[in-house]
Amino acid sequence: MATIKSLFSTLLDAYTKNKELLSVANNAGAHNGIYRGIDLTTKYTEAQISAKIQAGDFSDLYIGDYIPKTLTIDGTSVTSNWTIAHFDYWMRIGGSDMTQHHVILVPSNCLYYKGMNASDTTSGGYKGSRMFTEDMPKVATALKSAFGSSHVMSFSNLVSISVNTSIASMAGGGQTGGVPTWSWGWETRECDLMTEPMVYGGTIWSSSSCDIGSGKAQLALFNLCPTAMNIRSYWWLSGVASSVCFCHVDNSGDADANGASLALGVRPFFLYH
């Protein structure tokens, strides 16, 4: 018993002397390594959350923490837990430099279900898709209505802009067609579909390096809590897999690709501050 008391006393003394060293720093690097998963609105107002993020003070904000919101798109409302997936992911990235502190938020479920295009084609790459030109602007409008326009950040994203239907896809498996080298462009965005690396940590079905764009690293949410990607729904990613297929996450959690006209889930991300 005396030995246990002595050990406890030693540990308590060490903690007292070094608690500053043992505490979690308030920066992005430290907070991208800790998952919690609570409703932030039970502790803070949204104004307080936003003020902390804009100041780069991520104290008591952790991966998996969320803000419940209801978005209305094309007359249909859907409630999601908009979850912190990464702190300062886009910092110093883009055709124009990103210098503002932010968090990436992703919904806990799909907002709705729709094809990337009206037919099974990937012509024009991600930029040329109906999802890019029509659906993402609708989502952005709904986000600004729900969160407030000043809290939905614009960011510069590198996206694919064309597809060569005759080249071999880097996805393998006999797939034909893909995004040619240098077939990309910088686009100013307010929300977008995630890339394969943002979800899986690497490419699986993406046809070329141009499908990766700015989303080149895995989001901390999916690294720390892989079940966050497995929501028992099919949901689209931005990568071109072939001349007729885009990448997606399967309802069983597998990486997959399928015809662009299929009505799969829309699960975008945006930068919140």
Question: Model-derived features: where do they sit?
Answer:
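Collagenous Gly-X-Y triple-helix signature in extracellular proteins
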Residues: 22-273
